[in-house]
Structures are given as structure tokens and as C-alpha cells.
Amino acid sequence: MISPTSKRFVVVPQGGLGNRMRVIRSAYELARSGYGDVHVAFARNNECYCRFEDVFGEINPPLQNFRIAPAKWIDAPSSIRNLHLPGAVRTLYYDLQLNGFASFHREKIMTLSAHARKVYIATCYEFFDTKLEMSSLFTPSAAVKTAVESATRRFEGRVVGFHIRATDNAPALKQSPYTLFEQTACKE
């Protein structure tokens, strides 16, 4: 078994912003638990067309063994579109690659990575149990704060907001049709 102090995890969050936040929260907990250094490679792509720093400020509280930076070419999950080249190149550097949109859990990751010094994880799922609240870990960037304050300054009284995913997720639309949102709004 390899000492946790010599382990390095590179975590590439996938999916939309909400999924990425859950993955980052798992990565933070992985670092906080002392399993090694954790580097989150945040890619700006069609799934989430923003950089981390465009939306969020610093992660709090900061950890010495945890950082978030823009993804590099080699961090990209393998796909037909990139001819699987990043994955092939990564085999030269990483001892273990956990790819895809499968759900991983703490025990499975610890078992699989027990003899690996460098581990690559690309997922859209939470993979490390945590009780950390999103609001305690993530803070909005100055630009987002300013935009929200500007928009909400005009609100009067009590306001209820809805986020409706209408174009990108057919199963979600089946489970949460517009009529359900309308009924909930009327109850409020």
C-alpha cells in the first residue's frame, strides 16, 4: 500500500455546474481526509461553458493539499472526438484511471487506488461521502455577487425562484413537467 502523503489525485468534474459542484465537494473531502494531494482540473466546455473562477471565489476553508485550476488537454476524458489520445497519453503518467459517468464510492476508490501513486478520476457523480454544505464550501465570485445584487435590488417582498431545465434533459422533464412547477408556484 502506498502512503497517502505520496498520493496525487487529479479529479476532472463532468456535466453541468451542479454536478461539478458535487464532484468538487467530494474531491475536497478526499483532500480533507488526508488521502493525498488533490488537484481539480476544471474544463470549460459545452457541458459547462464557464471557468470556475468566473462563478466562484476561493474554496473555504483552503487546504494546502487541494487546488482547482483550468484543465489541460491531457485532463480531457477520452472520447471518439479526441481519438482517445488524452487517455492513451495518461497511461504513461497515471497508475490508475477511473473514467466515465459511473458512480464511484469512497471504499471502491480507496481499494482501487491502494497501490497507485497517481490517480485520475473523471466523473459527474459524488464519489466521497461528505456532510459539507455547498454554501459553506462555495462562495460566489465578485462578478456574480454584483449581478445578483443588481437583479434582486428591484424585488419587492417575498420572491420564489425556479430553475427549470427545459431543453437538455428529457427524463428530467418527464419527472418534473411544467405543470408541476405551476402548481407549486400557485401554492406559494
Which residue ranges define each predicted feature?
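Nucleotide-activated donor-dependent transferases that construct or modify glycoconjugates
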Residues: I2-G15
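Hydrophobic beta-strand residues in large extracellular and virion-surface proteins
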Residues: F9, V38-V40, V119-I121
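A short, glycine/small-residue-rich beta-strand->loop->alpha-helix junction that serves as a flexible
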Residues: P13-R22, P171-L173
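Histidine-anchored nucleotide/phosphate-binding helix
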Residues: R20-R32, F181-K187
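A generic structural motif
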Residues: G34-H39, E188
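A short beta-strand-loop structural module common to alpha/beta enzyme folds
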Residues: D37-E47
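Secretory-pathway luminal glycosyltransferase catalytic domains
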Residues: C50-E188
